[in-house]
Regions:
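Conserved binding/catalytic microenvironments
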Residues: 115-412
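C-terminal non-catalytic interaction modules
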Residues: 1-102, 359-412
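Basic/polar, acidic-poor N-terminal "presequence/leader" segments
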Residues: 90-122
Length: 412
């Protein structure tokens, strides 16, 4: 059973059950920020205009908070000719522009006017699976092209398919917009990612799929986290955990996975707002959830397990300024079977830990290995840290300057 089929098999919750979930006193408090209530109230996607502009992708913030050294100083050190400018930045920017344009197009209006044709559910399911895989792999140009073909068909399908297939069409729509949101966050486009996450939650609600709606909540919380809106991220995660409690207590693997991911997100928020006891408390809770999940497979977002808890512990320790704990935690992780992208993200955090100790050579070596393993996953983290490392030593090491050129951190 693939991810789409599992989600569809798990979806059926009656309208009264959904109303009961939403009637929890914590969910009904008027003072809480509740983006899902905006969906239920049928508020337009233009509500994102109330978010303050983000000046810099959060993925590019450094671990220590020190300002980046002007990258022109790297070139002035006599090393500016080493290597070629980073090859990925232009492609990533064009992909971001493409995804933003897709969200701006009036697919739903065209479908309402009968100007779009709906492919079969089987065809839509296959394309949605491919879109989800492209988003996970970071193949943003292909993802943009695939979504450009998929979204008009999905918007037409939810309006034209027989009633018995409507829930399937809405679920596929939710999954497609979730993939779009995840990609936009990786590309440093938080406001567009918010729009996509909002549409994903609206579609999941129409489908009656609690788990898919919760996955949309997780995606929205991640948008706020990466945008530095920590109070909003934590509130979404906290109230989503309340809603998922019943299913998780029954041992549903998807509910456990979502609770684990949301708990790790709260740990990250606590670390970035300088609450170490709270952060490590959430990590302890996440370990318990991972032990309950054990080896069972969960198909919902996010991926979760004991290894993810260990990786977040490293990042949390760096965010709290505890480089020694971060490096001890990293040394205890079994990386033998770890996917390249995940290992690259861990190595960026290891480099951040070494930077806290001002160990430039070790940090540079970790960054270089991360970029070699998975350039798309490591580039932003490396870009953010290079200037900080360069400011620690004059002139900067040759390997660091070469790495700067590789990731596009030198002026052309």
């Amino acid at each position: 059973m693939n991810a789409v089929e599992y989600q569809q098999a798990a979806r059926r919750r009656t309208a009264s059950e959904r109303r009961r979930d939403l009637s929890h006193p914590d969910l009904a408090r008027p003072d809480l920020v509740r983006p899902d209530l905006a969906v239920l109230a049928d508020r337009p996607a233009a509500w994102v205009a109330h978010v303050p502009p983000i000046e810099e992708p959060a993925a590019r913030r450094t671990g220590t908070g020190a300002p980046d050294m002007p990258l022109s100083k790297l070139a002035a050190a006599g090393q500016g000719e080493i290597g070629e400018p980073g090859v990925g930045e232009q492609g990533r920017s064009s992909a971001a522009d493409g995804l933003r344009l897709l969200l701006a197009r009036a697919h739903s209006l065209s479908a309402m006017l009968g100007e779009s044709c709906a492919p079969s559910i089987h065809s839509l399911r296959a394309t949605t699976e491919r879109v989800a895989a492209l988003a996970r792999a970071g193949e943003f140009e292909e993802l943009t092209s695939a979504l450009g073909r998929l979204l008009p068909g999905l918007e037409a399908a939810v309006r034209t398919v027989p009633k018995e297939s409507q829930a399937d069409a809405y679920e596929l729509t939710a999954m497609a917009y979730q993939a779009c949101s995840a990609a936009l966050m990786k590309l440093g486009e938080p406001l567009a990612a918010w729009v996509a996450a909002d549409r994903a939650m609206a579609a999941a609600e129409q489908a009656g799929n609690l788990l898919l709606a919760a996955a949309g909540q997780y995606r929205l919380a991640a948008v706020f986290l990466d945008s530095g809106e920590y109070a909003l991220a934590d509130e979404i995660a906290r109230t989503s955990l309340i809603a998922l409690r019943g299913l998780a207590e029954l041992g549903d693997p998807d509910a456990l996975s979502l609770r684990g991911g949301l708990t790790l997100l709260r740990a990250t928020v606590a670390a970035r707002t300088d609450h170490p006891a709270t952060a490590f408390g959430h990590l302890a809770t996440a370990r318990l959830i991972a032990s309950r999940l054990a080896g069972r497979t969960a198909n919902e977002l996010p991926e979760f397990g004991a290894q993810y808890v260990a990786l977040v512990e490293i990042a949390v320790s760096v965010d709290l300024g505890d480089a020694d704990h971060a490096l001890r935690a990293a040394a205890a992780v079994d990386t033998a079977s770890m996917p390249a992208g995940r290992l690259a993200r861990m190595l960026v955090d290891v480099a951040r830990a070494y930077a806290l100790r001002q160990e430039v050579d070790q940090a540079t070596a970790a960054l270089a290995r991360a970029v070699d393993l998975e350039p798309a996953e490591a580039r932003d983290g490396a870009f953010a840290l290079i200037g900080e490392l360069a400011s620690m030593r004059t002139p900067p090491p040759r390997l660091l300057v070469a790495l700067a050129a590789q990731v596009g951190a030198l002026p052309p």
